Amino acid sequence: MHLLGLLPRRAWASLLSQLLRPPWASCTGAVRCQSQVAEAVLTSQLKAHQEKPNFIIKTPKGTRDLSPQHMVVREKILDLVISCFKRHGAKGMDTPAFELKETLTEKYGEDSGLMYDLKDQGGELLSLRYDLTVPFARYLAMNKVKKMKRYHVGKVWRRESPTIVQGRYREFCQCDFDIAGQFDPMIPDAECLKIMCEILSGLQLGDFLIKVNDRRIVDGMFAVCGVPESKFRAICSSIDKLDKMAWKDVRHEMVVKKGLAPEVADRIGDYVQCHGGVSLVEQMFQDPRLSQNKQALEGLGDLKLLFEYLTLFGIADKISFDLSLARGLDYYTGVIYEAVLLQTPTQAGEEPLNVGSVAAGGRYDGLVGMFDPKGHKVPCVGLSIGVERIFYIVEQRMKTKGEKVRTTETQVFVATPQKNFLQERLKLIAELWNSGIKAEMLYKNNPKLLTQLHYCESTGIPLVVIIGEQELKEGVIKIRSVASREEVAIKRENLVAEIQKRLSES
């Protein structure tokens, strides 16, 4: 009966007239009446559907589809990153895309408001993961793992204002490398910076600089400048914006929005404009205010040792001690770092690319203990590669240069000039597949040879093997080079070996 409410007025009138007919007419009209009911219901449903406003097909804000062309470039970037992680002995792992909300809250400071909460499903409050670090710490605590070197590639979600033109999204991929365990100071930290340098150099993105600081130095700086301890995290979040905002704007935010005394903000300004190498570390040891703070001295001592290891790794010239680097996430406890691309003169026709940091990380010795019932700590240090921003840079450069990419890795195309040769082509392509050769054919019984050859040229397939009646009689197969258009007949039993030889030489 619930369907009757969907019927328009005319349908009701028609039904009532059928129902009120004399009894002797009801049997003959039963089938017709049932048909009219079904037709009326269907008409009502279709009308309601047609009255809905036009639905715009699009991806949600801050997300995007990746075409086959995009995926080729992305996979090359990820292959380089992952091979570097493996070269340094990391093991791969994964965690759920969503966690208990309680797992993620109070780990990100002011950024906690950017988490995506999921609708309650069966009593558990859940959120999409904001990064890959907190789930890793939860994994270590839950499984009582005390030592691990891992890498993790996966998507994360943040409700921030997306800037698609600069490679910033609400859904994006992160590539993380972390070292967990109790080790001698600064050795794992130095390796993380070495990995950053290897990846950024391998991607050939141009000159880059890795800024380093220490959260103990940041907190010590706040203390000697007169920042109330209750405002440390809030002011740290403001300082973290110096890569996007001018000092006067950051100062305005600290004073007007966060209630910091102007003279305190000015003292901070004297420090955050300092950057340099190991000589700046030595200079800060002599600073009359900073040298009186125990936390800051501990951080400076570790940075001095870190620069010694970086010199041995041959990358000290890529590292800058930068007192403006704060890293707003709450879980950092020691060394922090962030890689930025240096702006170089662009080539003719190129637009300057300003994408912010392309990699970042640091030490978080207390995060695992937040999940352990007894508060047992597992010291950790790690890094995260900003794949989306790197992909944006590579994509823009390819557009400027007019570069095209192959979307498949097909090596050989199986073709025929004659009709009714589908069975022979299927046998031949199966032989190639079984030999590990990447091969394709058209899914038609009688394709034209010109169509097949044109497909190879348009998709970049280097070799064509051609089989026809003449080749079948003579026990040979023709191999055609798509680039030179040269053809040569090869004995059928030697075909696989000849293809493998040609592919190895190309």
Curated annotation (Swiss-Prot):
It catalyses: tRNA(His) + L-histidine + ATP = L-histidyl-tRNA(His) + AMP + diphosphate + H(+). Keywords: Acetylation, Aminoacyl-tRNA synthetase, ATP-binding, Ligase, Mitochondrion, Nucleotide-binding, Phosphoprotein, Protein biosynthesis, Transit peptide. It comes from the Eukaryota. GO terms for cellular component: cytosol; mitochondrion. The modification Phosphoserine is found at residue 67. It is an enzyme of class 6 (ligase). Its main location: mitochondrion. Homodimer. Mitochondrial aminoacyl-tRNA synthetase that catalyzes the ATP-dependent ligation of histidine to the 3'-end of its cognate tRNA, via the formation of an aminoacyl-adenylate intermediate (His-AMP). This is Histidine--tRNA ligase, mitochondrial. The lineage of its organism: Eukaryota, Metazoa, Chordata, Craniata, Vertebrata. The gene is HARS2.
